[in-house]
Amino acid sequence: MAASRLPPATLTLKQFVRRQQVLLLYRRILQTIRQVPNDSDRKYLKDWAREEFKRNKSATEEDTIRMMITQGNMQLKELEKTLALAKS
C-alpha cells in the first residue's frame, strides 16, 4: 500500500486561502515599511510587524483570523496615508 503524499496536517481550501491572505498582508506591510525614511522608525515598525504576526501565528479560529486580517489591512492603510502625508 502506497503512503499518502499529503503531510498529516494538510490545510483545507479555506485555510489555504486565509493563509495566502495573511502572507500577502505581511509582504505588503513589509514593502510599505521599506518606504519609511527614518532608519530607526523603519526598524521599529519592522520589528513590531514581525512580532505581531508571530504572536498571532497560533490562531485557528476562523472569525478571529478574519478580524485580524481586517485590522491589519486598516493599519496598513493608515501607514500608507501617513507616508503619503509625510512625502507631500
UniProtKB/Swiss-Prot annotation:
Keyword Mitochondrion part of the UniProt annotation: yes
Primary location class? mitochondrion
One example of a Gene Ontology biological process annotation: mitochondrial respiratory chain complex I assembly
Cite the residue span of the transit peptide: 1-19
Give its localization.
Mitochondrion
Q: Which Pfam families match?
A: Complex1_LYR
Query: Known CDD domains for this protein?
Result: Complex1_LYR_LYRM2
Sorted alphabetically, the keyword list is: Mitochondrion, Transit peptide
- What is any one of the record's Gene Ontology cellular component terms? mitochondrion
- Range of residues in the leader sequence: none
Q: Does the keyword Transit peptide apply?
A: yes
The text of the family note is: Belongs to the complex I LYR family.
Its biological function?
Involved in efficient integration of the N-module into mitochondrial respiratory chain complex I.
Q: How is this protein named in the record?
A: LYR motif-containing protein 2
Protein species of origin = Pongo abelii (Sumatran orangutan)
